[in-house]
A protein has these predicted regions:
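Membrane-proximal helix-loop-helix interfaces that form the catalytic/acceptor-binding platform
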Residues: 1-128, 165-530
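Intrinsically disordered, low-complexity terminal tails and inter-domain linkers enriched
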Residues: 127-165, 301-313
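Short, solvent-exposed mixed-charge patches
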Residues: 532-534
């Protein structure tokens, strides 16, 4: 799904800001709500290949493929081939990851960097533990660690406090990259560093100097952006768009990896897709119940005299599954911190789209636990059901992404603008004009910057195609004749801008057409209006 030419608003922002210099990206990005490392990466590509959506999408896909490769490399070596293969499978076929992997945004790369950071922090902790054993740790052979499935031979590698220096460097660099890619990356990297610090203080104080040096360098390199963060936090607190809708928000938090918009609206594509998803759900439920029953029966036979709850706790908290606990704790920590921040800032920032930043450690947990399930029927059934949902999700995404309907409103806008000698084009909906500013660069457009905060500064990324005004009067002052108004609605209807302008005594609507745009699942309106008098 990377060869289509469509973008939605967030993607349009990535594309537009990449056309600026590194310094300009830093400045313009200060008005946005994300750090700028991803935009810098796009700017490098733009300098080499020009504004090329295919190149940008391949770049984002590379982030997910890098995540999948961790399964075949780091995870396979640390936790066994089963866990590695499962992790790669989930990285490539989790429906939501498949969707964002072709979206021109920073998520695929921040998921990779957070996961890489977490894995190497775990490696460092395990190595320090093996070299600083305590009574009660159990028998630890030289170079062997019971928290990992493989031993590491450090001969020939430069070490800092008994740990290969390259591991420290990978951990510190991926931590810094996470922070410069997304603010949830900041949260994840902070918790990873914090938990490693606690472990070092408790078990390997000799390594404290290395950790502190790395932490100080990270903070020093991130300090310039902290100046920007303060202003961005003010924007989020005062004018952020996200809000709670019960129970939808809770459902999104819990099930977003598989419960994508394509799965939710599968019935609008045909009953066959609903039937397939229903079969997948039944197969998953039956497989899970079969596996659980089989597991409890086997361990009750091996552990007579113990309660089932104690057996379950013993297996879930077994040493071999501690890395899975690490993944869940990290994910839960980020979620909790974001929830607390939302309460403090009185603005919802616990958005499922942001939670996916730490989905890598969560997938690691699932992969490790599944790798310890002995029932092949259970595992195969779960994976088959998961793959079925993923295929349906991808088929529907491709159907929407490559639909010719996506181009209809853009073509009509260009035709209307051309036939009216490039008139004034207005909208207060940046979701529409962000897209048209990228897709129809030859049409000058004007945006009504109504939002409080610093958003208008962020939208300078669309200059010179898009310019801003503070009111309709400012846009129409001294103007006479035909102009175009753009709008977007979730259901078919008249956009608010058209209604507002039509209510003026000096404005009338002469033509209006509405198009369904499958890629965004919204209705796109192009209205031709005339202003009489001065």
């Amino acid at each position: 799904g990377s060869f289509h030419g469509n973008v939605w608003f967030d993607e349009s922002y990535s594309v537009s800001i990449a056309n600026n210099s590194f310094a300009e990206i830093w400045d313009i990005g200060s008005g946005d709500v994300h750090p700028v490392l991803f935009y810098w990466g796009l700017h490098v590509l733009e300098s080499l290949f020009g504004q090329n959506l295919l190149v940008y999408r391949l770049f984002t896909i590379a982030g997910i493929f890098s995540l999948a490769m961790l399964g075949f490399t780091v995870i396979r070596r640390d936790f066994g081939w089963k866990a590695g293969v499962l992790f790669s499978f989930f990285s490539l076929f989790t429906p939501y990851l498949a969707y964002i992997s072709v979206e021109i945004r920073m998520y695929s790369w921040v998921i990779f960097s957070v996961t890489l950071c977490a894995l190497y922090a775990w490696r460092i902790a395990c190595t320090l533990r093996s070299k600083n054993p305590r009574e009660g740790d159990g028998s630890i052979e030289e170079g062997q660690n019971w928290w990992m499935s493989s031993a590491y031979d450090g001969d020939g590698c430069r070490e800092w406090c008994g740990v290969p220096c390259r591991w420290w460097l990978v951990m510190f660099l991926s931590s810094l990259a996470s922070a410069y890619l997304h603010y949830y990356g900041v949260l994840a990297a902070s918790f990873i560093n914090l938990y490693l610090l606690i472990f070092i203080i408790a078990r390997a104080k000799k390594a404290l100097s290395v950790f502190i040096a790395g932490a100080v360098i990270q903070v020093a390199l991130y300090a310039p952006w902290l100046m920007v963060f303060k202003s961005q936090a003010g924007v989020v607190s005062g004018s952020y768009w996200a809000n709670v809708s019960f129970p939808r928000t809770i459902v999104e938090w819990l099930f977003y990896p598989v419960y994508t918009s394509y799965v939710i609206f599968a019935d609008t594509y045909g009953f066959g897709y609903v039937l397939i998803l229903t079969v997948c759900a039944v197969v998953a439920a039956v497989s899970a119940l079969y596996g659980l029953a089989n597991w409890l029966r086997r361990f009750k036979q091996q552990n007579t005299g113990f309660k089932e709850s104690l057996i379950l706790a013993d297996r879930v908290l077994a040493p071999s599954t501690l890395p899975a606990i690490w993944g869940v704790v990290l994910y839960a920590s980020v979620f909790t911190a974001a929830l607390v921040a939302s309460i403090v800032m009185d603005s919802l920032i616990v958005y499922y789209r942001y939670l996916c930043v730490t989905i890598g450690p969560l997938l690691l947990a699932v992969s490790i636990w599944l790798s310890h399930v002995n029932s092949k029927v259970c595992v195969r059934g779960l994976l088959a059901a998961f793959l079925g949902v993923s295929i349906v999700n991808q088929v529907l995404f491709v159907q929407d992404a490559y639909s010719g309907k996506n181009e209809e409103p853009l073509d009509y806008l260009e035709e209307t603008a051309k036939s009216n000698s490039r008139p004034l084009v207005l909208s207060s909906d940046i979701g529409v004009e962000g897209v048209t500013a990228v897709e129809c660069e030859n049409i000058k457009q004007t945006f009504l910057a109504w939002q409080p905060g610093n958003w208008a500064h962020a939208y300078q990324s669309y200059f010179p195609t898009l310019t801003s005004v503070k009111s309709w009067d400012a846009a129409l002052d001294g103007y006479q004749g035909t102009f175009i108004v753009l709008g977007q609605t979730q259901t078919e209807g008249v956009p608010v801008d058209v209604r507002d302008l039509e209510s003026r005594d000096d404005v009338e609507v002469t033509d209006m057409k509405t198009f369904y745009r499958p890629y965004e699942r919204t209705w796109f309106t192009v209205a031709t209006m005339v202003k009489n008098g001065n």
